[in-house]
């Protein structure tokens, strides 16, 4: 079953990463690619993403997941969210020499499949 997730990223967060010499969009693509290849619990049959511009507020990351068991969707979304937050925090820490960034507001909304 295909589900669509939306992650809204504020423009201020994107600017903070840019000032640290990082491209948050590229980081999110890489994180999602690694997460998809890891295939948490073998429950994800496919995953794709695209970015929608929302000027000047930032952008939205849409992730389309083909999951085997909808009952595990909440656990899969939580695992993906944790992977994104932890990976972004580590990348920011390395790029800034130990600075921290507030990422707790990053969370996915589960939407109906936008492709159907």
From Swiss-Prot:
Matching entries from Pfam families are given as:
Adeno_E4_ORF3
What keywords sit in the KW lines?
Early protein
Is 4Fe-4S set as a keyword in this record? no
Recorded hits in InterPro entries, A to Z, give: Mastadenovirus_E4/Orf3, Mastadenovirus_E4/Orf3_sf
**Example GO molecular function:** identical protein binding
| Protein's UniProt name | Probable early E4 11 kDa protein
